[in-house]
Amino acid sequence: HALVRRQRQMCIRDSKKIDRRLNFAFISDVHLGSNPTSHLEKICNEVMLLDVDYLLIGGDLFDTNSFQAHDLEPFLKLECPIYFVTGNHEYYVDGYKEKLEQLRRYNISILDNEVVSFSSINLVGVSDNQSEEKQIQITNALVTEEMYNVVIIHKPSIWEKVSQNVDLMLSGHTHKGQIFPFNFFVRLKFKNVYGLFEDGSNRLYVSSGSGTWGPRMRLGTQNEIVKISIQPI
């Protein structure tokens, strides 16, 4: 059942910064190349049914030289804007710069070390291809106190080290361990491996990912698509 997905829904209602409800879908670690385009097709079909305002992608969208830009065609059926940050695997692919540029042809905006603002929300993207120190510096520079700040970053390593103005951080990378015994090794490296973590009004969500890497199998974990609703108090 490696490519079976579940949907997880999360509602945040405690912020006075929000002036209207916004719905996001969050996916990560699709690993096109290792996984077939048909898997992405099914993901996009499910996202369409979720009725979201934005699709956010937390890195590792593709991972091998067998990936071709036309594998992204399922994204063209989505009417919502799509925002993407790089993970570690994109940089392992030959000609990755050109392939990243081709994402724009499929309505995907690359948000590495950039911010877009809409309504009362800052959507901040942080590239994986830099040191943690640089990631912390960029995150703190892009968030603002008066806006609700959603930060997308591939690895969940810096959450406790960044500004309290980061209201919600979305990450992937860990695959929740994917299969035994890798789950033990992942827990040794990352404090926050899967799920929702809270510190006052600050939150981190670490996804189990929407695909697999290496063995096309999962034991004790599932692929997922996450729907996040942020609402005013």
Language model: regions and residue ranges:
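Single conserved hydrophobic/aromatic residue that forms the stacking wall/gate
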Residues: 1-12
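Soluble catalytic domains of enzymes that build or remodel membrane lipids, polysaccharides, and related
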Residues: 16-233
